[in-house]
């Protein structure tokens, strides 16, 4: 696997020197300063590449080229935004980058309710609390029809949770959910968020699939022409939230995506932490089934709690993800590719990480502190090395 590291650009508290010292050789980044829907100029892409090259690093994967909401809703100026997206892909390929990660989650990117969940050892993790989220939907956002998405017991628990909240608690929870986490290009106020939600009235899973299919039929031919591998990131969490459909959550969704535009350039980001939240997602089976379409991997683990929809981020070798078996399946796919002459390793980044040691006293992007990811990268690197020497001696070390 190619060891990569996500970097949020010049304002990221984690520097390029830090990344190099972590042992990563590739960087996963994006032009976050360019608004959604605007074409990325070649000059801007090359400028970012030059910044990385100055530190002996390469831009391995673009994560992400955000998809404008008009495309997802198939409304407004969607056709122009698709044309802009196509041109951005051409410009990325012109600069020699061949992998683009993206997602098709409506409105929100990845979602958490607690960004500082304290673990028994004193480190901090990200957490999604189903009851806290219900309290937000039912009593803060007051989304019409939200009660249909929760059991009677969850509604009682959510009301008790809300009644115990202070104004500061309400503001913090609201900000955690809708203000935008790292990688999300847009944040909202409550009123703005309600307006956005209303734009999805009448858009169910079938309609969102149709909208995504229209997008894929427009951009995958461009990816084929310029040699780009598109890698869709799964929903996080992998289920409908806020009354919004989610369509990249299960192996059935992966099969639908493959069949919709059957091209090797229409591929996946295997995010084990996103898919792994669902106990019914067999990660190894996903890799074995769609191995040739997996163009990028995010390796992390989560821990499901008493309510099966509540989870927190676990250590990379702990929690509900069998990282040993996952890495072995990825290396098996790499071996298959190399036997066919494709020598490029699959890019991997250690996804998220606990806030720990002196990072507890620093400004960090939630989930993206340096030391927690350094620990995760070292652990995954160790698993990979042991597997290679035991089962895959012919793979490049």
Swiss-Prot record:
Example GO biological process term? D-glucuronate catabolic process
Give me the reactions it catalyses. D-mannonate = 2-dehydro-3-deoxy-D-gluconate + H2O
Q: Which domain of life is it from?
A: Bacteria
Give the EC number(s) listed in the UniProt record. Answer: 4.2.1.8
Pathway(s) the chain acts in:
Carbohydrate metabolism; pentose and glucuronate interconversion
Required co-factor(s) are:
Fe(2+); Mn(2+)
Q: Which UniProt keywords apply?
A: Iron, Lyase, Manganese
Q: Which GO terms describe its molecular function?
A: ferrous iron binding; manganese ion binding; mannonate dehydratase activity
Give any Pfam family that matches: UxuA
Keyword check for Magnesium: no
Query: HAMAP family from the entry?
Result: UxuA
Sequence similarity:
Belongs to the mannonate dehydratase family.
Q: What does this protein do?
A: Catalyzes the dehydration of D-mannonate.
What is the name of the protein in this document?
Mannonate dehydratase
Q: Which organism is it from?
A: Yersinia pestis bv. Antiqua (strain Antiqua)
Taxonomic classification: Bacteria, Pseudomonadati, Pseudomonadota, Gammaproteobacteria, Enterobacterales
